[in-house]
Structure formats: structure tokens, C-alpha cells
A protein has these predicted regions:
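Amphipathic alpha-helical packing segments from all-alpha helical-bundle domains
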Residues: 107-144, 169-181
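Hydrophobic alpha-helical connector segments
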Residues: 57, 71-101, 135, 141, ...
């Protein structure tokens, strides 16, 4: 009978997350995790079906860290919630560049994106309620604001190539104001 594993799945994922945070996701190997735990790589395979299983759990743990970071920031911020979410995203990129890269800059073309639509719908509904926008205008505003916020988040990460600068995003602010004004103009029946 094989000996019981001395490390829990959570401890192994925490080691993989620490490696990601320090050296990037590509540095997460069976050997690196084992070295971090001062153990052999066999402990990983007694708790996980393989490296892909561990890597998926590491991505989930990084996502949970971002969600907790964002929720704490929004709760403690004096800014309106929508702005605070964007600010939290940018600060997370600056404070946790390797986790940010893992979550938001890896190739996700082969991944399931079904949860993304639900997250976006919550924000679009919020914008519709707060700014009296149509779903189409709120979606457009959110996409434009997300592009602006994501570009700023990419820029603030340490080791960013300073030769690449974002375009002036005043157009996004103008578009948001334009959509907001249009939402408050009376329609043909005089309703706002």
C-alpha cells in the first residue's frame, strides 16, 4: 500500500500559485512544485491525475485570488462600483503581474468561455440601470471601457515595454458621455 500523501491538494496548488506569482505560469513544473514543497514530484501525482489537472487547479486558484482582491477593493473603495471594478483590475495587474498574465493574457482560444457572458451580463445590466441605456448601448459602452481598462492594466505591469504606449483614449470617455446624453433625451413621445 502506498504511503499517504503528506500534502493536501490545496497545499500543492498553493505551491504552484507561489511559483506562478514569482516566476510565471510557465515555471510551474512537477520538479518546481516538488522543490517548493521539499518533496518528490510523486506527491503531485498522488493528489492530481496529472500536470494538466494541477495547472487547471492553479488557474482556478488564481481566479479566486483575483475575485477576492476585486471584491475587497470594490467594498473598500469610495469610487462608484463600476469604476472600482476597473480600478481593481488595473491595480491587480500592477501588484500581481504574473497572475494577471495567467488570467487575462494567455491564449484562451481553446477554452470554454460560457461563464464570460454571465459576468458581462451583470455589468451590462448595472450600466443599463444606472445610466438608463439600452442593452445594445450598455454592451457597447462596457466593451469600450473594458478595452480601455485592459490596455491600462497591461501598461502598468512591471517590466512592461515602455516603447509601446496606449493610444489616447479620450474617444472612449466622449463615447460614454454621448451614450449617457442620448439615454436621457426624450423619445418621439416625449419620454426620457
Amino acid at each position: 500500500m502506498p504511503p499517504a500523501c503528506r500534502f493536501t491538494r490545496e497545499q500543492i496548488v498553493a505551491a504552484a500559485l507561489a511559483i506562478t506569482r514569482e516566476r510565471g505560469f510557465d515555471a510551474v513544473t512537477a520538479r518546481a512544485v516538488a522543490d517548493t514543497l521539499h518533496s518528490s514530484s510523486k506527491v503531485i501525482f498522488s493528489a492530481f491525475s496529472g500536470m494538466d489537472d494541477l495547472l487547471a487547479a492553479t488557474i482556478d486558484a488564481a481566479d479566486a485570488q483575483y475575485r477576492a482582491y476585486s471584491a475587497d477593493f470594490v467594498r473598500d473603495s469610495a469610487d462608484p462600483p463600476y469604476k472600482a471594478v476597473g480600478t481593481a483590475y488595473i491595480r491587480f495587474a500592477r501588484n500581481e503581474p504574473n497572475l494577471f498574465h495567467l488570467l487575462y493574457m494567455r491564449d484562451r482560444r481553446r477554452e470554454d468561455h460560457s461563464g464570460d457572458a454571465e459576468n458581462i451580463a451583470v455589468l451590462v445590466d448595472f450600466l443599463m440601470a444606472k445610466l438608463s441605456l439600452t442593452r445594445e448601448d450598455a454592451t457597447l459602452l462596457h466593451i469600450e471601457m473594458w478595452a480601455y481598462v485592459h490596455r491600462n492594466a497591461v501598461d502598468v505591469r512591471p517590466h512592461f515595454d515602455v516603447g509601446v504606449r496606449p493610444r489616447h483614449c479620450g474617444a472612449v470617455r466622449v463615447r460614454a458621455a454621448e451614450l449617457g446624453r442620448r439615454a436621457h433625451q426624450p423619445d418621439a413621445d416625449g419620454r426620457v
